[in-house]
Amino acid sequence: QLGFRRVVLARELSLKQIRAINDTICSTSTPIELEAFVHGALCVSYSGRCYLSEVLMNRSANRGCCAQLCRQRYDLLDKDGNEILDIHGEPIHQRYLLSLQDMDRSLYLAEMIEAGVTTFKIEGRLKDRDYVTNIVAYYRQLLDQLIDSNQYLQSSSIKSIYQYNFAPNPAKTFH
């Protein structure tokens, strides 16, 4: 009715929530595709509710301009400016203090398809070329295996375009 064909879901949604959204959509007469994140950063805040970037850099994360300050390295200091030591007695220097490990839903692709997801989204913003190539190749490989083993699934892209001469390793790019 409103003229759109696809909904991009929040990355925080569970499979149960995605399934419920799909069930609601299926009860209408208008087919709508669901796009969901499968790999990328998880905000330390809740998507759409982060103000760190705006307060410190005057760049609104809620308007697509996140400076990803939570993905930077930091020193942990006490109130007097002295470095705080970790449990091994080492200074907490230049570590990822606010950054979670990237979301990796690779083990749940089949369940996501069953829940109604038709398009998978991989975060590439502010990522280097090697990271994106590695992660895209990894998911391409997994999706091709799922498609090849299920006669009811088909790829919307041309497989012959994706020729990688390396073995993708998603763990290689995590910090």
Region annotations inferred by a language model:
Residues 2-175:
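Surface-exposed amphipathic alpha-helical tracts and adjacent flexible/coil segments at the periphery
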